[in-house]
Amino acid sequence: MAFNLLNKDIDTLTCPALVVFSKSSSQKDKLAKVTHSEIHKALLPSLEEKTISGKHQETVVFREFSFKGFRHVIVVGLGKENEITHESVRQSMASAYEAIKALNVTEAAVHFDGITAGKKDAADFAKATAEGLILTSYVFNELMSGKKETKEINVHVVSKMGNDKAVKAAFNEGAILGSVVNFSRRLGDLPGNLMTPTILADSAVEGAKGIANLKVTVWDKARIKKEKMGGLLGVSNGSDQEPRFIIMEYKGAAASKKPVCFVGKGLTFDCGGISIKPGAGMEEMKYDMCGGANVIGTLLAIAKLKLKVNAVGLVASTENLINGSATKPGDVHTARNGKTFEVNNTDAEGRLILADALSYATELQPQMIVDAATLTGAMVIALGNTHTGYFTRNSALKTKVEKAAAESGEWVWNMPLTDFHVKDMKGTYADLSNISSGKGAGSATAAAFLEQFVGEGIPWAHFDIAGTGWAVGNRLPYCPKKGASGAMIRTFVEIAKQYT
């Protein structure tokens, strides 16, 4: 799929399909309003019959409408004028793209000026438009042997403001974010035999090629052992695939400026180890590396956007499988920062590899650390797949997270983290246990475990994307109904912006 922003009068274009928009009726206007005045007049019968109501995401397709240079016309609802937001535009663009695809055309135009009429923040709507279209275009079918969806669709976003500097910059930002999210989605969707720790590391290296000021370093098993990462090594013992530790460094500010640090869990497949998972749904455990994939995407986006910030992305990657060398319940390992932990359940392994990554992040003395992980089933019970739960005790970072999430349109929910949760993670024979001695609160106690590997005074937030890392398309139309979502990449970029 190709997208571009054209500085043109929409009526001068020739194209198989045109997308215009409708807005719901109001006290002033008894009928819904189509945002293109001539098409509004031509569709008055449909408006009077309520075929077009302007309801958000309503899609009405007029085949063979033959308006000027357009063969088909698609009318997509924006909802009520005063309820149009950046997120609602993303979702309307998802409806627009699906309608374009259903028409089986190779080219379409979007009447962007119909969205921005009377709106001061045209640039923000341009960003949302690009994001919505590109995110919806994602399809993972490369492993199919039969007919694949390969038809190229060119979508022109047409506006008389197409040469406006702010509008162009925002559209390009949305296009970068959308493409990077799709890059990370693909990493998550690849099955475990085609997405090993080595392949994940190679993907980070490949994705960073040609991007200025972005460096990728990959530690192999020997280096990981030398660096005393006992958590990552311990989990990897049960697999023939060697672990990898991925370090992505972006230099966008003065060398004296401390970095912001993003940490991701990269479990490319997790059977649970000796504490083996039930068979039902185990195939979805290829998604246990989505936190890592999304941190890779975050660093790619920050670098492509040339943000004036120093940023580091760290991904600890391994498989959690079973062989004669696998970690056993009761085994004790030592993390990079010297703390010891009992592995009382080998299926609580993500926190063990994150322990080493967070310890390393602390050594960088960053301005803040944020981590992302498909960490606990308890988070799915608590919040389902609508919100990403996050934990932080730092009020300033909490404010930044909430602001960033509001800007990105991703839903987050602040979860409790207290000293009582820390107490529940104390070990009997080691400093810590990797599972709680208390009842319930599995997500909070997991966060409490991670907190023990973050340096005192460093602002830190933990995002548990177990419920939002994949299969969220029932709520978000620009996400696949099945498959990786790319959760939190856009929010993390917005967090990074606040440190520029």
From Swiss-Prot:
Where Mn(2+) 1 is bound, by residue?
A: 270, 347, 349
Compartment annotation: Cytoplasm
Any one GO BP annotation for this protein: proteolysis
Q: Per its UniProt entry, what is the enzyme's top EC class, as one word? A: hydrolase
Asked whether the keyword Nucleus is assigned, the reply is: no
Q: Which residues bind Mn(2+) 2?
A: 265, 270, 288, 349
Q: What is its main location?
A: cytoplasm
Q: Name one Pfam family in it.
A: Peptidase_M17
Q: Which reaction does it catalyse?
A: Release of an N-terminal amino acid, Xaa-|-Yaa-, in which Xaa is preferably Leu, but may be other amino acids including Pro although not Arg or Lys, and Yaa may be Pro. Amino acid amides and methyl esters are also readily hydrolyzed, but rates on arylamides are exceedingly low; Release of an N-terminal amino acid, preferentially leucine, but not glutamic or aspartic acids
What role is this protein assigned? Answer: Presumably involved in the processing and regular turnover of intracellular proteins. Catalyzes the removal of unsubstituted N-terminal amino acids from various peptides.
What family is this? Belongs to the peptidase M17 family.
The protein's name = Probable cytosol aminopeptidase
